[in-house]
């Protein structure tokens, strides 16, 4: 499928009007013959794109103690301590703003019960529940990996829409990222990519280009 993907990526970029920001490139895949009511047909997997996402990934860290220090030193987009967490639990508007301001959350493992209690109803529907990590972890390697990570999953609808890069990346790099996501679908779908009903590529504000 690589040639078809390459051609669709090129067309999507060419048809996208210039904007005053760097647009992301998305892939949209609709799956046939998949009953999402069955738990075995639902999945959510973190995937490392070989050529990165092309834009900075904003990360929030929920922690106390040494992890807070590491997070601040690393300059992450959002740092939430225990007191902040409790305050967000009282202010739904602020909690939504925090949830929408980052792409991924990391949380100190022993704080996950509090995260579930105070932020679960906000983060869950957004597919942003934190990745639990031990208090002793070195954050930098994880933060670096998350810069190239996307979540590929099927929950309520037999479809996925995810960022696979940015418009200033080469067509070849974007196509390789897309093929990486298709490999994930090969693993999770009974008939692999043969179960794909339709597939599209688009930039953030651009028209949809059909691949299959």
Curated annotation (Swiss-Prot):
Quick one: a GO biological-process term for this protein? Answer: translation
Q: Which CDD domains does the UniProt entry name for this protein?
A: Ribosomal_L1
Question: Could you tell me one molecular function GO term of this UniProt entry?
Answer: rRNA binding
* Domain of life (superkingdom): Archaea
Q: Which PROSITE patterns match?
A: RIBOSOMAL_L1 (PS01199)
Disulfide bond annotation, renumbered to this chain: none
Example of a GO cellular component annotation carried by this entry: large ribosomal subunit
Keywords, in A-Z order: Repressor, Ribonucleoprotein, Ribosomal protein, RNA-binding, rRNA-binding, Translation regulation, tRNA-binding
Write down the Pfam families for this protein, in alphabetical order.
Ribosomal_L1
Subunit structure comment from the entry: Part of the 50S ribosomal subunit.
The record's comment on protein family reads: Belongs to the universal ribosomal protein uL1 family.
Q: What does this protein do?
A: Binds directly to 23S rRNA. Probably involved in E site tRNA release. Protein L1 is also a translational repressor protein, it controls the translation of its operon by binding to its mRNA.
Q: Which PANTHER family match?
A: 54S RIBOSOMAL PROTEIN L1, MITOCHONDRIAL, LARGE RIBOSOMAL SUBUNIT PROTEIN UL1M
What is the name listed in the Swiss-Prot or TrEMBL entry for this protein? Large ribosomal subunit protein uL1
Q: Which gene is this protein's source?
A: rpl1
């Amino acid at each position: 499928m690589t040639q078809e993907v390459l051609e669709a990526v090129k067309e999507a970029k060419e048809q996208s009007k210039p904007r005053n920001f760097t647009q992301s490139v998305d892939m949209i895949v609709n799956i046939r013959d998949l009953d999402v009511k069955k738990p075995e047909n639902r999945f959510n997997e973190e995937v490392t794109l070989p050529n990165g996402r092309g834009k900075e990934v904003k990360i929030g860290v929920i922690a106390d103690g040494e992890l807070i220090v590491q997070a601040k030193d690393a300059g992450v987009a959002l740092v939430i301590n225990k007191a902040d967490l409790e305050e967000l639990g009282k202010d739904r508007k602020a909690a939504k703003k925090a949830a929408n301001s980052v792409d991924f959350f990391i949380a100190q493992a022993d704080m996950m019960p509090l995260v579930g209690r105070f932020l679960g109803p906000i983060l869950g529907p957004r597919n942003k529940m934190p990745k639990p990590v031990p208090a002793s972890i070195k954050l930098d390697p994880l933060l670096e990996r998350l810069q190239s990570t996307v979540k590929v999953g099927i929950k309520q609808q037999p479809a996925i829409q995810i960022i696979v890069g940015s418009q200033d990346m080469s067509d070849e790099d974007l196509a390789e990222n897309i093929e990486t996501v298709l490999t994930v679908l090969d693993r999770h779908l009974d008939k692999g990519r043969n179960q794909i009903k339709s597939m599209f590529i688009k930039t953030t504000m651009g028209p949809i280009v059909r691949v299959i």
